[in-house]
Amino acid sequence: MLDNHQKHFVSANDFDKYVNHKLKLNLPWINECGSKARKKALVNAETAFKKFFDDLASFPRFKKKSYQAVKLYFPKNNKGDWTIWRHKLMVPTLKQVRLKEFGYLPVGAVVISGTVSYVAGRFYVSIVVDIDEKSKHNKDLETSYRTATDGIGIDLGIKDLAVVSDGRKFKNINKSSKVKRLEKRLRREQRCLSRKYESKKKKGGKIATASANIEKQKLKVQKLHQRIKQIREDYENKVIHEIVKQKPRFITVEDLNVKGMMKNRHLAKAVAAQRFNCLLTKLKHKAEIIGIEVHMVDRFYPSSKTCHVCGHIHKGLKLTDRVYICPECGYTEDRDFNASLNLRDAKKYRVA
């Protein structure tokens, strides 16, 4: 938070003191939530501003409550809070809550805090668990992986999500019939929602006070968005598991300029649907757990235009050319597979 009068950064602790001693006197509704939950929101705001000052993120945007997923932060105040059983969970204030899905939360774990969120008509819980270093990594999972192999290069793209230098190819899940069918339904429900808004405007109603029919239609749209998102996330996790279970010595990927790619209005939607940044973040995290080094090659490295055999750079190669034909030595190969081989053998990189 920024103080306009003193022109300096105000920490979460200082702002919390201001809320307790001054702001809370005029705004009694602040007492409706717990002090630790309020402090957590201030800490999150402080973290967002620090990332902005360190050039790690853009300036924090104001997030209107009605446009955000409902999230409730519950600290552990008593010994019995956040006790985990196989089929239920002790949530502070809400008491025992049954779980729809089993096996995701560690039974008997020491929970520090948790957050309950409401997204598209469903409740989700995420918890912070205190674990020791010995059990930090899943040893049973690590031993199930194969012995270490040579390094691999991965070329990410739109036609296929990932092409690996060992010959594996992972398709674009957004081209599957299931996702296309859901996107078609989403467009139809969005048009229906838009018509309801337009109808209310013609009748002179206030859009801010939406009707019950509009709220029901919004929930349908939210559920479709959530379903498509879950399909993409599940596919990403499966792709990453298939890549790291071979346990290569290193994984080389290109440092993609996703923000620049989004400026192309013809490719922006397809690039956004591929979720490259999310995929790379998960890959780095999983590789760190297994002990695999991730190499990041500069985004200006011509991996697709370089011949893997003779090293000639084919400057006339277009995005529509799906087969790489070297004008010097005649080497012919799929352009994405050729790029993955060049990434694998790249000499200049940085360790992620």
Where do the model's predicted regions map?
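Nucleic-acid substrate recognition interfaces
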Residues: 1-352
